[in-house]
C-alpha cells in the first residue's frame, strides 16, 4: 500500500461561488436513474448522477451504472472525457489501447481522455460497472 498522506483541502481559487442559501444534496438510487442504450452494445446504462437526470443533475461529472449481460461486448472506442470504471460485480476483459486486461470485482480502471477502451463480459453473470465520467 502507498504511504498515507494528509488531505490539505480544496483550492480556494474556485470559480464556483458559494451560495447564500443552504445547499441540499440529491439522494438517489439506480432506480431513479435515466436508462440509456449505447450503440453496438446489448448492455444497458443508467445515468444516476448526470445532467440528464433531473433527480441528481450534476454539472461537472456523471455516474453511470452499466450492466453488461454474459458474453456481450461493448466495442472499443475513445472520446474526450476522462473516466474511471469501477468493477462492482462479475468479470471480463477490457481492451485498453489495444491490449487485453482481465478485470474483476474490486478493480478500478482510470481512462485518460482519448484512451481507447472497450469491455467484454466473459463470465456467466451480469457484469456491473460503475462509470464515473468528467465532464459528463
Per-region residue spans from a language model:
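A short, N-terminal "cap"/entry segment at the start of jelly-roll beta-barrel domains
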Residues: 1-60
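A short hydrophobic beta-strand segment most commonly corresponding to one strand
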Residues: 65-66, 84, 110, 124-136
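Residue-level detector of conserved, well-ordered beta-strand and adjacent loop positions
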Residues: 50, 69, 88, 104, ...
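Hydrophobic/aromatic beta-strand elements that line small-molecule binding cavities or substrate pockets
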Residues: 64-66, 106-107, 117
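Short acidic-glycine-tyrosine-enriched beta hairpin
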Residues: 84, 98-114
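Short, conserved beta-strand element in jelly-roll/cupin
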Residues: 65-70, 78-94, 132
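Conserved short histidine dyad/triad with adjacent acidic residue
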Residues: 45-52, 62-79, 113
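Short beta-strand His + acidic residue motifs that chelate non-heme Fe in jelly-roll/DSBH
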Residues: 74-76, 94-95, 111, 117-124
Amino acid at each position: 500500500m502507498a504511504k498515507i498522506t494528509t488531505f490539505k483541502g480544496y483550492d480556494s481559487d474556485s470559480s464556483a461561488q458559494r451560495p447564500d442559501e443552504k445547499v441540499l444534496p440529491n439522494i438517489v438510487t439506480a432506480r431513479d436513474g435515466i436508462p440509456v442504450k449505447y450503440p453496438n452494445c446489448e448492455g444497458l446504462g443508467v445515468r444516476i448522477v448526470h445532467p440528464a437526470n433531473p433527480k441528481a443533475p450534476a454539472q461537472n461529472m456523471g455516474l453511470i451504472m452499466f450492466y453488461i449481460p454474459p458474453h456481450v461486448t461493448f466495442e472499443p472506442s475513445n472520446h474526450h472525457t476522462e473516466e474511471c470504471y469501477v468493477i462492482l460485480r462479475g468479470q471480463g476483459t477490457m481492451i485498453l489501447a489495444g491490449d487485453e486486461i482481465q478485470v474483476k470485482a474490486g478493480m478500478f480502471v482510470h481512462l485518460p481522455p482519448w484512451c481507447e477502451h472497450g469491455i467484454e463480459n466473459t463470465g456467466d453473470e451480469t457484469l456491473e460497472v460503475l462509470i464515473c465520467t468528467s465532464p459528463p
